[in-house]
Amino acid sequence: MRIVVAGVMAIVSTLTSAQQPWQKIQMPTAAQVAQIWKAPPPEYGPEPYYGLNGTVDETVIRRDLDTMKSLGYQAVTVQAGYGMPFAYLSPEYFRFFRTFVEEAKKRNMRVWIVDDAGYPSGFAGGKFTEQKPKLRMQALTAAQRIPATAGESVKTTVGPDTIAVTAINADDGTTVPVTVTNNAIDWTPPGGGWTVIVVEHEFKTSPTRSDTNPKRVKDGTQSLEDYLNPAATKQYLEFTHEQYKKAVGDEFGRTIMGFRGDEPDYSINGLPWTPEFFDRFTEIKGYDIKPYLAAFLQARGAKLTDQQLRAKADYYDVFSQMFRDGFFKPQGDWCAANHLEYQVHLNHEEMEMDLTRSEGEFLRDMQYVQVPGIDTIWHQIWKDTISDFPRLAASASHVYGHPRAFTESFAAYRPAPDVDMARYILNEQFVRGVNLVETMYFPATSTPDAHKSSYMEDPAYPALLTYVQRMSYLMSMGRPAASVALYLPSSSMWMGDAAADAAFVTTERLLSERQIDFDIVNDGALAKDLTAGHGAFETASGNRYAAVILPDISLLSQAALDRLHAFASGGGHVLFLGRTPSLISGKTILDARSATASDFSWASVAPGELPPTPTPPAQPPASPPTALVVPDAIAQAVSAAVPLPDVTLDTSDTALRIIRRRLKDADVYLFFNEGPEALSRAVTVRSEGKTAELWDVQTAKIVTTKATGEKGTIRMQLDMKPYETTVLIVR
């Protein structure tokens, strides 16, 4: 009997530990997709962001879930809000949440749980401040900046939290360590002007907007956890996720899809730090970073020496590794172990220079996140902006083998979109690889002065949600097919290289306007994460890159360089735009060697400079962006690096955007006309298929269209209205 029971339990364990279909890459046939896409499973959304505010009760949630369902929502992202009749994370709250999940289940809706009572994620409704203050976020700061001149002694006391005291020469940036004796310094500078900087560690948090904060403001009264400390994240999971598991764990992987995080970052004046940082830094880099800290904490505008810039890049390299391993990975692992997915978006996705300071490295942070995301707020995506940043989330999914990438859309939009503009904003993201949609904002009807976002009141809105549901499902099926990789120059940005950032953003635009489907990859992907083949790099999703483009970068690792060389030797195309990197790093960036011409003799290099692309704005711009003028040398080099593009037009059109996916027996092409003019072009697409079909996402109708085929391509006429999408299936 014991043997039988053990066998049954083993089978049950195997079944429950297996990934659900929506959690893994699926390769159905086009016929199988056609059978399902008219009414896709609820796991593919869309979902509103729902705030449990005010005197919320069972009557309220039933009414609100019914409204969501009638609009066409198939899932809901739910956050504990303000003014609830029970305390957040209390037994009463979890009893109510159990009821909420049961009501969603009755309606065959799925639930994503917001992991905190506001944002950024990681304060557990104030519990770190109240109960675990030693696990709060910490930083290194300049506690004192003392001017000093030759011959005048600097005498002062320093606090017990002092890490280092360093004098910095005002003329050349050289530094001198200052000895601390009995919590005091006594130092006389040599000639010239100096600043003595006292570096301390302190508990310092990014501001949090918590619905448990009685002041209803975004401030530092409820501290975030120490993101760099796995023990702090373990405590966070105990405060939050484990309690949900006790209350509703039987619905994990069934009604409950996973946990949703929001903008974890270091929006602080100082350097991200944790007590284990220096030991970890020495383990990774092999040297002591403390002598350089004061240079990093100089007043705004201070110029760092080349050596200091390199050491600072090492600091942010280690910071980003510790952020990934201390915060994102434990949550992704916990969700996977509990049959769930972790979805999260960061801050500053559209401003990578800022992101490298606050979060380190986008793709590194997202490596173990099952559903990487972005958010689009303010005026970031509109008909008068250039916004390719959603491709970051899709690329993280593609590189690391996850089927979906999500968007939080429409929060704090200026102006608020109507239904037509909402469709445009979502289509801009679909064609860049996003395939799971969360919309802002649906407050509980118990919320004082509650009102849904205005576009939700439009009679045309349910039709848009039907469209979104089908598009999300269709673009989640199969695998990505991008054959071009664009390098994200985070390590150059760690050294303050704004030119590399600007070139990266404009190269995104260049490729998009030339209908070149691409993924974004980082140094870690090139150095080790991608599977190297003969003239190809393969992602965990199965798409293979035949070309890698590196835009105007100043730094590259030796490991990435070596693998790029082997890739090119096998027939892959490697293209440097503008310049080749001047530095090649090994274990450290501090000791990076100077690059030589022979390092890149095997690669293509296109001289010239791309014009900057405007950053997606917070407010409507005074005028739309001007047309992108690409230097001839760069345009020709890109064409040579991508000799067999997925899509070729008989006449160029920079308004057309495309993305390609691969089903078991068919190619999927999504076209989006982002321009205000109708488009009529003969289009040639790569495919071994013989039959071309147009799939109408709004009506679910499928019609065969006239096409001719030759040598692995299909040619057809493409006619599109302004701001229209077209789905082409070739099988």
Regions inferred by a protein language model and the residue ranges of each:
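Sec-dependent signal peptide recognition
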Residues: 1-8
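N-terminal signal peptide c-region/cleavage motif recognized by signal peptidases
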Residues: 13-17
